Amino acid sequence: MSDISKQMNNLSVNDGANTVNNNNSFRGGRSQYVPPHLRNRQGGGNQSGSSSESSDVPFGGSQRGGFNSNGFNNNRGGFNNGGYNNNRGGFNNGGFNNRGNYNQSFGGRGGRGGFNNGGGRYQRPTPGVGKWQDGKHEPAPRNEKLEVELFGTADDSHFQSSGINFDNYDDIPVEASGDKVPEPITSFTAPPLDELLVENIQLSRFTKPTPVQKYSVPIVAAGRDLMACAQTGSGKTGGFLFPVLSESYMKGPAPVPESNGAFSSHKVYPTILVMAPTRELVSQIYEESKKFSYRSWVRACVVYGGADIGQQMRNMDRGCDLLVATPGRLKDLLDRGKVSLANIRYLVLDEADRMLDMGFEPQIRYIVEECDMPAVKDRQTLMFSATFPRDIQMLARDFLKDYVFLSVGRVGSTSENITQKILYVEDDEKKSVILDLLSANENGLTIVFTETKRMADNLADYLYDQGFPATAIHGDRSQYEREKALAAFKNGAAPILVATAVAARGLDIPNVSHVINYDLPSDIDDYVHRIGRTGRAGNVGIATAFFNRNNKNVVKGLIELLSEANQEVPDFLTKIAREGAFGKMTRGGGRGGSSRGPSRDFRRSGNSGWGNSGNSGWGNSGNASSSGWGGNSSSSYSNTNSNYGGGYNNNQRSNFSSGGSYGNQTGSNSWW
C-alpha cells in the first residue's frame, strides 16, 4: 500500500465505528465523523476500538478530556468535593446551587442551557415538578432518587428531625394575642394542610408540629398576618413554609400580568417572597423549601450577594414561584427589572430584628413600599425571629395588618435543652482551655465563636496544628470557600467550625452537640442566637462560654438567661454583678441584658413610655410618620442611635452594631 493510501486510511471517517461513545449517546450503526485533532486522544472520540468513557454518564454530564453534545470537555472547572459541583450543564443533583443542579433537574422549567438542550419549545417533564392546570393542582409522580437526595434515609444522621426532648415542647407556654385568634392545630393532617404538603412533611420525618407551627398554620389559613417570637431552634422555618406552601397548593399561581416592554418576558413574578439577612440563612431556607415544594407547581429560587448574579438570573428563568433573598441582592434585581413583586401573596421576613440591626431598613422599605408589591391589605405578611425588641415591633406596624402576636416560650431566652456552662478564663489561657474541652468532647460537631475574622482564622489554624480538624467561616471568605467549609463541617471531615457572627443566626446544622463562645459577644441577644445552634428541634446540647472581666457588660443578661433556663449561675458572675460600677456598663454595650425581646404584645401597653402614641395607630397599619414617637417615628430608629440606621447609608460597616459584633465585619457586602 502506498504512503498516501496509508494516510487516507488513517483519516477514514469509518475509523472507530461502533466504538465512539460520547454524550451524544452514539453506540453503533452509522459511523460518526471524528475531527483529526481529536483522534487517538485519551478521552477523545477514538480509543483504538474501545469506548472513550462509560456509557452511564448522564446526559449533559462532564467527561474529563472528552466531548459531549455541547462541545469538547464541558467541565467548566468542575469541582466535586463534599457535594459541591460547579459542572455547568450537568445533571448532578449533589451540588449546592449551580447550573445543572437541582434547579435544572427538579425545579426547572427546561430553560436555557438546561436539560432541554437550549431552551427549545419542547420541554421534557422535569422530575419532581408538578403543575397547575385547569384550576387544579397536579402533583408530579414520586421520584425515589430525588427523595433520597432531598430527605435522606431514616438512618441518615445528616437529616435530623426531632430529638429525645421533642415532647417537652408541649409544656412550653404560648401566648397568642389579637382579635379572634384561630385555634391551634395538634397534628399534621389534611385538612387543614394540603395533602401533598403533609406527604412531604412525613417524608421529612416530622411527626408533630412545634408550638409555633401549631399556631402559624391556622393563622395564615384564616388570612391573618403574623408576628412570631419563638425560641431559637423551635421550627420557625417550618412555621412560615408550611402554611404559605399549603395555601399556595390549594389556590394556585396568580395570573402573570400582560407583557409590557421588550424584556418583560424575562421578568419573573414570584408568589412568595422570603427575606433574610445573610446568604447562609437564605440558602438554608431554600434547601428546606425544596423539600416541602417537592412534586408541586411551586419552584423555589435563591438569590444573595457574593455570587454570580448572571447565573442566579438564569436559574430564575427556569421558574421562580418562591423567592428567597437577601435585601441587597433583591433590590439589585428589582432595579434591573428582573423581578416583579406584583403577584406577591405572602411576604415573610425572617430574623427581622437582625435585618434592621444590620442596616437593611432602607432596602426593606424600598422593596415593600416603593416597588410594585401589593399593599398591606392585599397580601399576607409574616415576621419571624427569636427576638423582637420594642423598637422593632413599632417599626413592624408599617408592614402588618390585623396581625396575631405569637410569643412561644421565653422570648429572647434560651432553651432548657441546652446545658450552659460559664467558665472564667483569661484571654491568654483560652487556647489551653479549649484544647481540654475538645479533648473531652470528641462526639458530634462543635461550633466555636470568635468576635473577629482574624481570630477565627488563627484559632482554626491553631486547632488544626494541634490535631483537631477545624475549618473557619467569616465575612472575608468567598462564597465558594464558605460553602466548602460548611460542607466539610456537616459531613464530619472537619467537625470543628470556627465562626464569627456571620454563622450565628438561623443556620440549622444537624448534630451540633457543643457550642463554645471563645469570645463572648457584647450583645446578649447574639449570645442567645449563638448557643441556639445546638439543642435544636428538641435535641440536647452543651454551650460553654469563656468569661472574664472584659465581658462585664453582659453579666446581668447572662445571669437572667441562666436563671430563666434553670441553669447554674457561677459565683463569680454574681460577685461581678454586685459591683456597682458594672451596672452602668450594661446599658452602654450593645443592648445588654435589659432590652431583650419582649414576651408581650405591645399593643396592650397603653401609654406607658410611648409619648403621645398611646394605643392610637399601634394596631393600625399606618405609615411611620404618625405621632407614635412624638411625631418623629419615621426617623426614630435611624437617629436615636446612629450605630444602627446611619451605618449603612454612609457605607460605614463598622457602625452596624453598637457592641462591635458586626463592627469587625469589614466589607460585609460579601455576605449580603
From Swiss-Prot:
SUPFAM superfamilies attached to this UniProt entry: P-loop containing nucleoside triphosphate hydrolases (SSF52540)
Biased composition (Polar residues): 1-13, 652-672
Location (main, coarse): cytoplasm
Catalytic activity, as annotated: ATP + H2O = ADP + phosphate + H(+)
Motif DEAD box, chain ranges: 350-353
Protein known as: ATP-dependent RNA helicase DED1
Keyword field contains RNA-binding: yes
Species this chain originates from: Candida albicans (strain SC5314 / ATCC MYA-2876)
Region (Disordered): 1-142, 583-672
Enzyme Commission number(s) from the entry: 3.6.4.13
Recorded family membership: Belongs to the DEAD box helicase family. DDX3/DED1 subfamily.
